[in-house]
Amino acid sequence: MSSENNAGANLVNQFNAAGELTHLLTLEGLPKEQILHILDTAQQFVSVTDPSREVKKVPLLRGKSVFNLFFENSTRTRTTFEIAAKRLSADVINLDISTSSTAKGESLLDTIDNLVAMQADIFVVRHSVSRAPIEIANHVPTHVHVVNAGDGSHQHPTQGLLDMYTMRHFKQNFKGLKVAIVGDIVHSRVAKSNIHALTTLGCEDIRVIGPESLLPSDLDMLGVKVYHSMEEGLKDVDVVMTLRIQKERMEAGQVPEGDAFFNQYGLTPTRLALAKSDAIVMHPGPMNRGVEIDSVVADGPQSVILNQVTFGIAVRMAVMSIVAGN
């Protein structure tokens, strides 16, 4: 994991010459002040998404064009980015990858060049290839902005930010917080983004729990505590985040059996009881009920999974607003 992240960090330039955030590509190395600025800005946008508000829009991106380029499937991320852009009054174009010229062999950067020629202002990019959004950001003109919506198993910065927002909302601060991330860590861009953000924000007790086959070999370099037992790893934690098994990133024969995984690592009410009584349960989605999480827990009073989705709109509004210069 570290080799991939370090390689990515060497290629990333998220700031312009004036020191302003112009792309959001990774949370690795993003300063604490910048993360807090995004979270604070998102907090201001929460009121825009309030159901009681008659007009759920602000004009910050009026006249701007946001292109959603999703080369991997998505429900929550793509939809909340679209909602966020529209609530900022942007024009939103969702490129249908299956019918675009990339399906005919056009290169990624040639596609980008053509969309820039159509006056694109912001690209929101999800791609199966790690660091593809970084390649795009290094290629586009300086007036065009790129937001990474998840690249391979590398990073998912806006998911990490909305997770930080959720934790801060329910737990107020990160100092003294105990966070457990459970499941398929080795393939998870969400886990990597969360670990980087939590470390930057001062969380000193980050735990990862899973079978050895689903944990990167170099986790100790990130300063996290590694557990192979739920009973040990969940003791007295404030936050439990479960992750799905990413079968699409595994070779044949590597995929754990769902029942066997659930029996050992599924988040059940009994296991959740090992955490603090006011612990919150998080999941970036999509959930596989009965594999990494019990429905009783997913739908229970400690679950903030749907809050994550709601907060994601405000966080993505904040990110697009900030990179566009607001």
From Swiss-Prot:
Its EC number(s): 2.1.3.2
InterPro entries: Asp/Orn_carbamoyltranf_P-bd (IPR006132), Asp/Orn_carbamoylTrfase (IPR006130), Asp/Orn_carbamoylTrfase_sf (IPR036901), Asp_carbamoyltransf (IPR002082), Asp_carbamoyltransf_Asp/Orn-bd (IPR006131)
Signal peptide range: none
Pathway involvement of the protein, from the record: Pyrimidine metabolism; UMP biosynthesis via de novo pathway; (S)-dihydroorotate from bicarbonate: step 2/3
Keywords: Pyrimidine biosynthesis, Transferase
GO biological process, one term: amino acid metabolic process
UniProt KW Membrane keyword: no
Catalysed reaction equations from the record: carbamoyl phosphate + L-aspartate = N-carbamoyl-L-aspartate + phosphate + H(+)
Binding-site residues for carbamoyl phosphate, renumbered to this chain: 76-77, 126, 156, 159, 285-286
Positions with a binding annotation for L-aspartate: 104, 189, 244
Function (record text): Catalyzes the condensation of carbamoyl phosphate and aspartate to form carbamoyl aspartate and inorganic phosphate, the committed step in the de novo pyrimidine nucleotide biosynthesis pathway.
HAMAP family per UniProt: Asp_carb_tr
Protein family according to the UniProt entry: Belongs to the aspartate/ornithine carbamoyltransferase superfamily. ATCase family.
Protein name listed in UniProt: Aspartate carbamoyltransferase catalytic subunit
